[in-house]
Amino acid sequence: MELTHIITGEAKKPLQYLSSCEAVKGKGLKGDRYYNKTGTFNKPQLDQSVREISILPYESLQECNDRLDSSLEFKELRRNLVIKNFDYEKLKNKEFQIGTAIFKIVRTAPPCRYLSKLLDEDMMKGLKYIGGYRAVVVQSGLI
């Protein structure tokens, strides 16, 4: 498992790549829209504990682009961490470390219509079953 990209940013704006970032228990990535509680899905009726971190397997981007005949970049998919050789089955119900931070997967991250609208692409088709995962920060640390 290898972290290839860290992606954060403000709500409703293009996201940015970072070389490192602080992951904060109970909040997410410092400076990210969900850390700041300004994300599109930061609504009181939604479970915020599943919004801390989003993870995209590295290999999902190529499959998504193939399905859509497009050339999207990782940051356009609006997931926080891109990880090469990510094995969900090995990590299911387990804690794992990236840098000095510890995470735990809490659910899948299916594609949403908001992303389709933002990119003017059928992301429901592009990311169907490969949209990634949501995780919580179990122990704060630097990634």
Describe each region flagged by the PLM.
Residues 1-97, 107, 142:
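Electropositive, beta-rich accessory/interaction domains or terminal extensions
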Residues 83-139:
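Glycine-rich active-site loops that engage anionic ligands at enzyme catalytic sites
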